[in-house]
């Protein structure tokens, strides 16, 4: 498909004008069909969950703040009724059902959704090395990975990653604490405080004036020249993806504890901010495994970086970048500032994702301020992308397509997945808050 031909498409023209759009995915095929395209299944997610469990004693020792959750890194699921009322008042549109916030923004260690996938891939690599060199067995107490002799062993190896910020933060901190030498290749969008935090752990931060794609490519290139360097590939990694996917079974458990039903008459809608796609893609995969066709997964992207929407809509996936259409990929949502989506995630998930929408930067600041005022919860701009999702779902076309009745909608649960912000320094947060209009 020629780019010139694409530019004649009225929907693409809206993207090129940076208009906010909503697109209901006609390729969405139901869980039975959709899962067959992924190339992974529930046993892979279960293995990831078991690996995280094996590392629980390690976390209790290395990060004492995780002791209260017995070494399991999991985020709170909280009701945001005041925010719901404020959204209804401000947008003059109904939100039926309950509105909850999944606070991955406040996950331990790195304060973002990347504490799921990024940390998991570092653990998988550390475990592989430790098992191969007979330092541990799978039945051992993994807290011994804190011992100096094992840290010395890991220091012979290095890890590299390209990132807009949060993935680098999770991999950098986790890798450094285990003893690895870590290099994080940071794109121009990365926040200064994230670079400083990494340096405080002894991580080598390599800065670029270009965007995310360049940082990843350079990280990959640097790792190739060193046989002891492991490159974590945010664009193609199934290991990262599986780390995120464990969120599905964890959420199911939280629902059981909170008495929240998900079935035909109690649909679940989850709104996930999307950058390159690994985090939201992996979480959506886990959600579909856990809740089947009763969960609807909607991706939210900035108007200036709609890479996954563009890839899935055109079917070109990683063969097209937003810049090919003159879209600049410059956004306040630094975690979502990605011009070319993951080809792996796009192809794996295009039959499981129910919809996409875009949101302008100013709304992210407005919603950030509103959440702070109503619920006293502070997030970074990227994390607010999902907040207007429930307003889009009221669209009659969406309800018709999925045969959702008003009664089912009244029983629905909406989850806004808050992807980051828990570690933002106060000075930076005050800047964000000053940019909101209400």
UniProtKB/Swiss-Prot annotation:
PTM annotation (N6-(pyridoxal phosphate)lysine): residues: 114
Reaction catalysis annotation: D-serine = pyruvate + NH4(+)
EC number(s) per entry: 4.3.1.18
Names of required cofactors: pyridoxal 5'-phosphate
Top-rank lineage group of the source organism: Bacteria
One GO process term, biological-process aspect: D-serine catabolic process
Pfam families: PALP (PF00291)
Coiled coil: none
Top EC class for this record: lyase
SUPFAM superfamilies per UniProt: Tryptophan synthase beta subunit-like PLP-dependent enzymes
Keywords: Lyase, Pyridoxal phosphate
InterPro entries: D_Ser_am_lyase (IPR011780), Ser/Thr_Dehydratase (IPR050147), Ser/Thr_deHydtase_PyrdxlP-BS (IPR000634), TrpB-like_PALP (IPR001926), TrpB-like_PALP_sf (IPR036052)
GO molecular function terms noted in the UniProt entry: D-serine ammonia-lyase activity; hydro-lyase activity; pyridoxal phosphate binding
Family indicated by similarity: Belongs to the serine/threonine dehydratase family. DsdA subfamily.
HAMAP family the UniProt entry points to: D_Ser_dehydrat
Protein name: Probable D-serine dehydratase
């Amino acid at each position: 498909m020629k780019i010139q031909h694409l530019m004649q498409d009225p929907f693409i023209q809206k993207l090129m004008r940076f208009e906010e759009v909503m697109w209901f995915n006609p390729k969405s095929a139901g869980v039975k069909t959709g899962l067959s395209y992924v190339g992974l299944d529930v046993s892979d997610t279960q293995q990831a969950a078991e690996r995280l469990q094996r590392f629980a004693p390690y976390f209790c020792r290395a990060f004492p703040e995780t002791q209260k959750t017995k070494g399991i890194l999991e985020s709170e699921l909280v009701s945001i009724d005041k925010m719901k009322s404020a959204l209804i008042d401000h947008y003059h549109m109904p939100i039926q059902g309950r509105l909850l916030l999944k606070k991955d923004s406040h996950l331990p260690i790195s304060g973002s959704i990347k504490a799921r996938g990024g940390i998991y891939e570092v653990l998988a690599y550390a475990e592989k090395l430790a098992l191969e060199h007979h330092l541990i067995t799978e039945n051992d107490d993994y807290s011994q990975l804190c011992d100096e002799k094992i840290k010395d062993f890991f220091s012979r190896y290095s890890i590299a990653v390209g990132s807009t910020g949060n993935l680098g933060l999770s991999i950098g901190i986790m890798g450094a604490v285990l003893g690895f030498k870590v290099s994080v290749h940071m794109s121009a969008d990365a926040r200064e405080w994230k670079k400083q935090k990494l340096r405080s752990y002894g991580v080598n931060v390599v800065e670029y004036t270009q965007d995310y794609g360049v940082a990843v490519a350079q990280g990959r290139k640097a790792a190739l020249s060193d046989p002891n360097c492991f490159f974590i590939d945010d664009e193609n990694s199934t290991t990262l993806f599986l780390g995120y996917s464990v969120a599905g079974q964890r959420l199911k458990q939280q629902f059981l504890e909170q008495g929240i039903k998900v079935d035909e008459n109690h649909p679940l809608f989850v709104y996930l901010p999307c950058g390159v796609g690994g985090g939201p893609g992996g979480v959506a995969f886990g959600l579909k495994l856990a809740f089947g066709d009763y969960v609807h997964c909607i991706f939210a992207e900035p108007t200036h970086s709609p890479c996954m929407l563009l890839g899935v809509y055109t079917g070109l996936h990683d063969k097209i970048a937003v810049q090919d259409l003159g879209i600049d990929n410059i956004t306040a949502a630094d975690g979502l500032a990605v011009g070319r989506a993951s080809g792996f995630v796009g192809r794996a998930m295009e039959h499981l994702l129910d919809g996409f929408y875009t949101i302008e930067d100013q709304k992210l600041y407005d919603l950030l301020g509103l959440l702070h005022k109503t619920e006293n919860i502070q997030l970074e701009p990227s994390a607010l992308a999902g907040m207007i999702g429930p307003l889009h779902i009221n669209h009659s076309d969406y309800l018709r397509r999925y045969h959702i009745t008003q009664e089912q909608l009244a029983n629905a649960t909406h989850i806004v997945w808050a992807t980051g912000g828990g570690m933002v320094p106060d000075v930076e947060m005050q800047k964000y808050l000053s940019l909101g209009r209400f």
